[in-house]
Amino acid sequence: MSHGHSHGGGGCRCAAEREEPPEQRGLAYGLYLRIDLERLQCLNESREGSGRGVFKPWEERTDRSKFVESDADEELLFNIPFTGNVKLKGVIIMGEDDDSHPSEMRLYKNIPQMSFDDTEREPEQTFSLNRDITGELEYATKISRFSNVYHLSIHISKNFGADTTKIFYIGLRGEWTELRRHEVTICNYEASANPADHRVHQVTPQTHFIS
């Protein structure tokens, strides 16, 4: 499969640990409800339709009966159509505690039916991933680049050295906007207003932005 890689300088930081009721944390990652699952594609999945199963409620992220594993090599490409416009603020990628865990994630926006050949182009943002087996690490996006997203593509370009890649959960945090003729409805899928009230580790990883 064709693919390219590019990186910029960056580092990691973990926010202070914060407590939050599970139902509020679940609401924060509620954008999965705004995905058009019937049209969602996962390229190079070993079992057809399994890629849809990793977009699930945050409180079900530890359910290991639902996962996606790559087929021919370590790459996966998710094409995610939303039912409205999204302002994407953060992503969680949860995998196995071994070399099958993704090590790099590349995000593209508004390219429906994206193929692996299309990943030759520059992504909106690239993340170097840490192993996350609990679904607690959030990778913060450059919000100005993801403020009007109707289609998100997530390219898992490599893992930590295994032949295949396995993912149990992908969490998306942000705002969803439904455009109507007479009104605009905005659903804010974020944690509580007071950041000291909930627990989340936020990671600012290596990134690459289009200039």
UniProtKB/Swiss-Prot annotation:
According to the UniProt entry, which residues carry Phosphotyrosine? 189
Q: Which GO terms describe its cellular component?
A: cytoplasm; sperm cytoplasmic droplet
- Annotated PITH domain ranges read 20-192
- Note down the stretches annotated as region Disordered: 1-20
Q: Which InterPro entries match?
A: Galactose-bd-like_sf, PITH1-like, PITH_dom, PITH_dom_sf
Pfam families in the cross-refs? PITH (PF06201)
Q: Which UniProt keywords apply?
A: Activator, Cytoplasm, Phosphoprotein, Transcription, Transcription regulation
What's an example Gene Ontology biological process for this entry? regulation of proteasomal protein catabolic process
Main localization, broad class:
cytoplasm
Subcellular location(s) per record: Cytoplasm
Described purpose of this protein according to its UniProt entry: Promotes megakaryocyte differentiation by up-regulating RUNX1 expression. Regulates RUNX1 expression by activating the proximal promoter of the RUNX1 gene and by enhancing the translation activity of an internal ribosome entry site (IRES) element in the RUNX1 gene.
Name the protein family.
Answer: Belongs to the PITHD1 family.
Q: What is this protein called?
A: PITH domain-containing protein 1
Q: Which gene encodes it?
A: Pithd1
